[in-house]
Amino acid sequence: MDALDASKLLDEELYSRQLYVLGSPAMQRIQGARVLVSGLQGLGAEVAKNLVLMGVGSLTLHDPHPTCWSDLAAQFLLSEQDLERSRAEASQELLAQLNRAVQVVVHTGDITEDLLLDFQVVVLTAAKLEEQLKVGTLCHKHGVCFLAADTRGLVGQLFCDFGEDFTVQDPTEAEPLTAAIQHISQGSPGILTLRKGANTHYFRDGDLVTFSGIEGMVELNDCDPRSIHVREDGSLEIGDTTTFSRYLRGGAITEVKRPKTVRHKSLDTALLQPHVVAQSSQEVHHAHCLHQAFCALHKFQHLHGRPPQPWDPVDAETVVGLARDLEPLKRTEEEPLEEPLDEALVRTVALSSAGVLSPMVAMLGAVAAQEVLKAISRKFMPLDQWLYFDALDCLPEDGELLPSPEDCALRGSRYDGQIAVFGAGFQEKLRRQHYLLVGAGAIGCELLKVFALVGLGAGNSGGLTVVDMDHIERSNLSRQFLFRSQDVGRPKAEVAAAAARGLNPDLQVIPLTYPLDPTTEHIYGDNFFSRVDGVAAALDSFQARRYVAARCTHYLKPLLEAGTSGTWGSATVFMPHVTEAYRAPASAAASEDAPYPVCTVRYFPSTAEHTLQWARHEFEELFRLSAETINHHQQAHTSLADMDEPQTLTLLKPVLGVLRVRPQNWQDCVAWALGHWKLCFHYGIKQLLRHFPPNKVLEDGTPFWSGPKQCPQPLEFDTNQDTHLLYVLAAANLYAQMHGLPGSQDWTALRELLKLLPQPDPQQMAPIFASNLELASASAEFGPEQQKELNKALEVWSVGPPLKPLMFEKDDDSNFHVDFVVAAASLRCQNYGIPPVNRAQSKRIVGQIIPAIATTTAAVAGLLGLELYKVVSGPRPRSAFRHSYLHLAENYLIRYMPFAPAIQTFHHLKWTSWDRLKVPAGQPERTLESLLAHLQEQHGLRVRILLHGSALLYAAGWSPEKQAQHLPLRVTELVQQLTGQAPAPGQRVLVLELSCEGDDEDTAFPPLHYEL
């Protein structure tokens, strides 16, 4: 088959987050691919939606069947107006709107052998087994990648056949390992020592590696990949280097990923010899039983011309009998598996198989779409070959609570597909719910779709509130499928809410654009949360997650929470008094705001991350903080004599350094940029080496420049070096923007201008302060001459126009922000012999961009939707709930029961994080003395310290006089006196914290809820 023209320019802005997952080569192959999706019920719609969002070149839809009521429970592209229309034709326009760069067409005829030759990948969903076998055989014959996917109620099935000789070019999601080189010996073998702190542990015997940036032993640079041997001390044998030049410094060693070959069986063979994706032998047996259940369901439909009726015991027993009579599965062509059939499992599958559920098709459709991408891009290992997924734990554990055939009968309702599994009574429960969704980004959009289709809050007494303060950006459109290009710049919450109402007109959804954080507790307070039945969080910040989780714990609300990073995803559920409360992963939470040590970043960087943080700080200091400082001085009209020492310190560096002279034109900006280049990468390094010479030795004889400390070398400016020129171009343009001057993007003219400019005088440049101590010392020596010079400079700045502080914007590649940071970091890497990272990775690191892809977000939303069923159904034991973690790149999915809440004790008391001490304020309101007495009499607690936030209400160690001032006051009166704030209108509880006599330091007492 011929691919589309894949040479067309890749829209990096649109696919920016996806590119961090797949890379440009894979994306080029994706946008040149042709895919056929046959079957446009809920599952097919999910597969198609994900492929369009991710930019597949051409998508052909095939489904001539008319839309029916049960489709609307999971097919978000259809509406009541589409009843009796062809599902493919009714879906085409909305799919095309998701991404105008994708050709979305409809095929109305049969699927023929000639038709299949037009595609690289063919996907069948909800197809009869006979159709699967026919199409699968033809695809296998012609080398067309083939997928078959289906869901039956709470069970899903996915089959992949990529042929007998399919090469995966890039099997893993991880970036190739790169490490800095310390030394390479001449010999056979040559021994390469990695710089201390490099990831030596991750290199393995037999790895193929390449080399770059080496000075001296240049023969290794860009040579063919070499195989390595890892020695016991962590050094690497890299082959014969006897004849190579002597190693001098620098360089990096980089892993070369090895392709892998996959051999798949055709569907007709794999039906009897199924190879299933499973994590244990128990899961293998479970999957084999589900495999037989699907085969029996196909046979039932073939015999009766219909699927089993919802919860019909007679039909279910017929399916069990058909499963018993199936030909036994085989381990090999000759060896049977000899596994017992789990008839109870098959029976349950059959009873609930008539339904179609939005969360199930979202989950399986995401996995199927990811497999399509693997087939096209040859990136990541494909499934081998069957995947079975079930969420039968959504059903009540008590058999007496299972729905009846009458409760599950078709009603001509948009929820018929869901009613067939859970019954009409459960549907009404869903419609009466009031839920809060925090975050309307990628996961939030997918959750809104699930909520709309399942009917959450769609009744007259139900409701759904969507909170998001952000506005839509173009880079959102490849994942956040409720948004369109015309929505860019509009509030996410408002657009998402309107789009969700379009999916289900009955949905009672309210958008709010106020953030949910400590500053808005007067909005999202006691009254607000009293109306909420549960919370779903779709946030990309651990700080925000922790806050929302704390509110759920405070108000005893169930929390559904999901997150993604690339093809990694998690979906977790937290139930009051049933599971543990949410805790952010310590490593992730700590890394969110933890900077590297200042001295490391400024003077002793050893990784590209260090240089990027330095470059980012340079941007802030040069183009934002200095401008804000001058503007503040202009507005305050402050003379130097009126300033205290800290103010002088604040102005000293920017005025005498960064902003020494106000530029008048583009040439002045270029001259400034060249001077700053010299300051940072030449003179600054020379001055550092005067402080710490290359031969400096510590008292114990250890060289100062050793281990992670790499001795830097000053750079010489060279207009023929693109990185040198990019720095000056970006810095000059940013300086011009800050001063309201026109810039330039002409590289040729810049080269010519630089030849004419005089070389900067190092004596006229800003002083380098190697530490805050030096800066303070410079201020201490600030005599009359320096004061006179600064006053003169301040007078010059005070009469000019205000400066424009620049706020770093990572997603606009035309503004020179990222250009400056990338160039500065790369030059810093050259100074210190550090392997640099490419522009894309630099942008990801400095912009703190989370790699994202539509498939992962859809999968975790589906998994959360399944947990929603359990939360809404009523009291369920902890064994019913599941935390889920998945890695689509490696076909990994684990679901496990949440932990129980940890129990703490103090004397006779026991509590968990879900408990609290409740004390009514009373009428008239009790005093502090009364509150303390109540706690001692009712709970046996002698309070040592009582706090409200940071306000200390009581301390047992206070003097009698101090206690006499506080004890007679009413609690709210005391709080207002100490904080200056009375309880907010509608506030029902004051939260107090206490510690008691006799407790250990680590005892965390439950919060005291003082009920107003």
Swiss-Prot record:
Residues 23-575 are annotated as: 2 approximate repeats. Its EC number is 6.2.1.-. Gene3D superfamilies: NAD(P)-binding Rossmann-like Domain, Ubiquitin-activating enzyme E1, FCCH domain, Ubiquitin-activating enzyme E1, inactive adenylation domain, subdomain 1, Ubiquitin-activating enzyme E1, inactive adenylation domain, subdomain 2, Ubiquitin-activating enzyme E1, SCCH domain, Ubiquitin-activating enzyme E1, UFD domain. Transmembrane segments: none annotated. GO terms for molecular function: ATP binding; ISG15 activating enzyme activity; ubiquitin-protein transferase activity. It is found in: Cytoplasm; Nucleus. Sequence repeats lie at residues 23-159, 423-575. ATP binds at residues 442-471. SUPFAM superfamilies: Activating enzymes of the ubiquitin-like proteins (SSF69572). Induction: By DNA damage. Upon interferon-alpha exposure. It is an enzyme of class 6 (ligase). GO terms for cellular component: cytoplasm; cytosol; nucleoplasm. The active site is at C599. Pathway: Protein modification; protein ubiquitination. One of its GO terms (biological process) is protein modification process. Pfam families: E1_4HB, E1_FCCH, E1_UFD, ThiF, UBA_E1_SCCH. Keywords: ATP-binding, Cytoplasm, Host-virus interaction, Ligase, Nucleotide-binding, Nucleus, Phosphoprotein, Repeat, Ubl conjugation, Ubl conjugation pathway. ISGylated. Ubiquitinated by RNF170. Expressed in a variety of normal and tumor cell types, but is reduced in lung cancer cell lines. The modification Phosphoserine is found at S266. PANTHER family: UBIQUITIN-ACTIVATING ENZYME E1 (PTHR10953), UBIQUITIN-LIKE MODIFIER-ACTIVATING ENZYME 7 (PTHR10953:SF143). There are two active sites within the E1 molecule, allowing it to accommodate two ubiquitin moieties at a time, with a new ubiquitin forming an adenylate intermediate as the previous one is transferred to the thiol site. E1-activating enzyme that catalyzes the covalent conjugation of the ubiquitin-like protein product of ISG15 to additional interferon stimulated proteins (ISGs) as well as other cellular proteins such as P53 in a process termed protein ISGylation. Plays an essential role in antiviral immunity together with ISG15 by restricting the replication of many viruses including rabies virus, influenza virus, sindbis virus, rotavirus or human cytomegalovirus. (Microbial infection) Interacts with human cytomegalovirus proteins NEC2/UL50 and UL26; these interactions inhibit ISGylation and cause proteasomal degradation of UBA7. (Microbial infection) Interacts with rotavirus non-structural protein 5 (NSP5); this interaction promotes UBA7 proteasomal degradation. Belongs to the ubiquitin-activating E1 family. This is Ubiquitin-like modifier-activating enzyme 7. It comes from Homo sapiens (Human).
